[in-house]
């Protein structure tokens, strides 16, 4: 029985100085400090359980998300958890439809990142009270209960509530076997850890060599800053991994539409499976034009990590603008909105390959994609989940990768809880790590 009245909501600005090592660097984000607005929900329940929620940021600006979380707090405080999850669609709409706050959205930007952090904490607490990892909580729900968590506003022209229920009902066949498959073998992953744009060749070679030894067969390279440098780096990686392994490329929104087509035509010799975020995440028709132009070269378009909401995904699918759909556990409105996108992707038969990495993104999105395989898509064809090998040591329940696959979490919750000492030391600007760095910069 889900219970307890929310008695406290706190939010922390947690930042890791990843820019010092070039980790996470790409053509648009050259010096990111991987960060998070970290939400903690407490209730008056005797079990003492807490819910932890995250939304991912790149350093500066995290304080703005923290402000937005605090602005949403009145919609959460003193609410009964059982009533929240009993009408989760209504609660989602309450958060996203505040008559004043929605003006700085609606359902996009900073206020939506804050919504994700709050809702992620609610889902974590719900799963903990049920004693299940989040993926299992979702898998065990009947179709009608799952669908009741989704706000279908603005997407009923593509997916109705009844259609969503029918998709889930049809996927009941073979669920038990697929769950056993996940528990035994895990969900296939690819690595982005080897080829950040800021890495020198020596680092790239070393990390690529280590990844091959560890059994990785799918690799992603950052591109978009300099064509000749991209050609050199892609040739280096392709030569190292060989012709049979899978290579993807990611431009992180660097190009205009004609530039994307021209650039990728020149990189086609390296046989990339996809080009990720070739242009503005808001340009649906631009993505469609790029997708059409690159199809004869065998290159698909992948996007989604900075798509604001389910409506953008709806239009990308309608316009046939992408071959691979990339959900993000913190950009959309938490599990609720991601459920709607997974179901739309199933209807359009587009594979979902989630965005991960960051602070806690791997920990969160593993639950969604494992659920997707068991209860929605029922397929691993052309599907894989991103993995980045850093910052997991700061989480109480870090991801487990075995033979280049995500192994299903067994601990109750959404895997969002960070270690207290890590939060304390990396809190900005008063944590020990930042006091030292800011002091050194001041000198």
Curated annotation (Swiss-Prot):
| Annotated residues for binding of Mg(2+) | 250, 276, 305
Q: Which GO terms describe its biological process?
A: amino acid catabolic process; carbohydrate catabolic process
Compartments annotated for it: namely:
Mitochondrion
Annotated substrate binding lies at 24-26, 34, 220, 252, 276, 305, 355-357, 386
Q: Which PROSITE patterns match?
A: MR_MLE_2 (PS00909)
Cofactors required: Mg(2+)
Keywords, alphabetical: Isomerase, Lyase, Magnesium, Metal-binding, Mitochondrion, Phosphoprotein, Ubl conjugation
EC numbers:
4.2.1.68
Q: Where is the active site?
A: 222, 355
Which residues are annotated as modified residue Phosphoserine in the UniProt record? Answer: 148
Which principal EC class is assigned to this enzyme? lyase
Gene Ontology, cellular component aspect: mitochondrion
Enzymatic reactions = L-fuconate = 2-dehydro-3-deoxy-L-fuconate + H2O
The record's section on PANTHER family has: ENOLASE SUPERFAMILY, MANDELATE RACEMASE, MITOCHONDRIAL ENOLASE SUPERFAMILY MEMBER 1
- Protein's job: Plays a role in the catabolism of L-fucose, a sugar that is part of the carbohydrates that are attached to cellular glycoproteins. Catalyzes the dehydration of L-fuconate to 2-keto-3-deoxy-L-fuconate by the abstraction of the 2-proton to generate an enediolate intermediate that is stabilized by the magnesium ion. May down-regulate thymidylate synthase activity, possibly already at the RNA level, by promoting the degradation of TYMS mRNA via an antisense RNA-based mechanism.
- The name under which this protein is listed is Mitochondrial enolase superfamily member 1
User: Taxonomic classification, please?
Assistant: Eukaryota, Metazoa, Chordata, Craniata, Vertebrata
């Amino acid at each position: 029985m889900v219970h307890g009245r929310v008695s406290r909501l706190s939010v922390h600005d947690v930042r890791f100085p990843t820019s010092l090592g070039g980790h996470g660097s790409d053509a648009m984000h050259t010096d990111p400090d991987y960060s998070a607005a970290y939400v903690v929900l407490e209730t008056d329940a005797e079990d003492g359980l807490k819910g932890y929620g995250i939304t991912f940021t790149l350093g500066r600006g995290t304080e703005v998300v923290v402000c937005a979380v605090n602005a949403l707090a009145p919609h959460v405080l003193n609410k009964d958890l059982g009533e929240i999850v009993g009408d989760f669609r209504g609660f989602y709409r309450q958060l996203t439809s505040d008559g004043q706050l929605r003006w700085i959205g609606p359902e996009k930007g900073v206020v939506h990142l804050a919504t994700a952090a709050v809702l992620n904490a609610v889902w974590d607490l719900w799963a903990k009270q049920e004693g299940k990892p989040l993926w299992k909580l979702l898998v065990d729900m009947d179709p009608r209960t799952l669908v009741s968590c989704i706000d279908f506003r603005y997407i009923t022209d593509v997916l109705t509530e009844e259609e969503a229920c029918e998709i889930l009902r049809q996927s009941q066949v073979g669920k038990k076997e697929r769950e056993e498959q996940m528990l035994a073998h895990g969900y296939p992953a690819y690595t982005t850890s080897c080829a950040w744009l800021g890495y020198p060749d020596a680092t790239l070679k070393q990390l690529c060599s280590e990844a091959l030894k560890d059994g990785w067969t799918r690799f992603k390279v950052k591109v978009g800053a300099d064509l000749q440098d991209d050609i050199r780096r892609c040739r280096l990686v392709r030569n190292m991994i060989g012709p049979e392994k899978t290579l993807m490329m990611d431009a992180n929104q660097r190009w205009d539409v004609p530039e994307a087509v021209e650039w990728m035509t020149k990189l086609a010799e390296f046989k990339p499976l996809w080009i990720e975020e070739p242009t503005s995440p808001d340009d649906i028709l631009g993505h469609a034009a790029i997708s059409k132009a690159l199809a004869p070269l065998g290159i698909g378009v992948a996007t989604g990590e900075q798509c604001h909401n389910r409506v953008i995904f709806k239009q990308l699918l309608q316009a046939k603008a992408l071959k691979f759909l990339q959900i993000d556990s913190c950009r959309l409105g938490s599990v609720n909105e991601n459920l709607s996108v997974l179901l739309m992707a199933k209807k359009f038969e587009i594979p979902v390959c989630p965005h991960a990495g960051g602070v806690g993104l791997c920990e969160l999105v593993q639950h969604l994609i494992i659920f997707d395989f068991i209860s929605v898509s029922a397929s691993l064809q052309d599907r894989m989940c991103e993995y980045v090998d850093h910052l997991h040591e700061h989480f109480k329940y870090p991801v487990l990768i075995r033979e280049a696959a995500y192994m299903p979490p067994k601990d109750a919750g959404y895997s969002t809880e960070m270690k207290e000492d890590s939060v304390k030391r990396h809190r900005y600007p008063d944590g020990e790590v930042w006091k030292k760095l800011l002091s050194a910069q001041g000198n």
